[in-house]
Amino acid sequence: MLFGVRTWGKGEDGALGLGSRENARVPTRVQLTSRSCSWGEEASGPDMGLRCVKVACGSNHTVVLLHNPSLPVAQVASTGSSSYGQLGHGSCDGLLELRPVRALQDCKAPVTDISAGHEASSATTADGRHFLWGRGEWGQLGTGDERSHWRPVAVDVSLMSD
């Protein structure tokens, strides 16, 4: 379980991570299994060692930074709508439960921060790299183009003016 983390509100597209599209009128504990924070067939069943570091809520999706004591670094997981790739899983298929953003597992430095906005998400690593994904049709991801990205893309913030 995510200790102390609960979600409530509009459950459309699974944004609450509760396993359904139902709204939650009161704070409801998010059930989490080891599958939410690992990659492999052996990942199943509850993992009481998982700890939530941060939660970021977008318009119809949620991004979570998780720490699993059996892994060397924190992991990013997401749930909800992925109509523009805002979950970072490489497809437009939404999710009803948290699943890891696999493209971030190979970062050279651990992810230390996350954020979620309207149909977009981001992660920052300990070495200052920024990764963005989701809706980008107006260039709002800072990737140098005007298209959506379905997986995290590193953005060079040194190009940004002061």
What are the roles of these predicted feature ranges?
Residues 1-162:
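Eukaryote-biased RCC1-like beta-propeller repeat architecture
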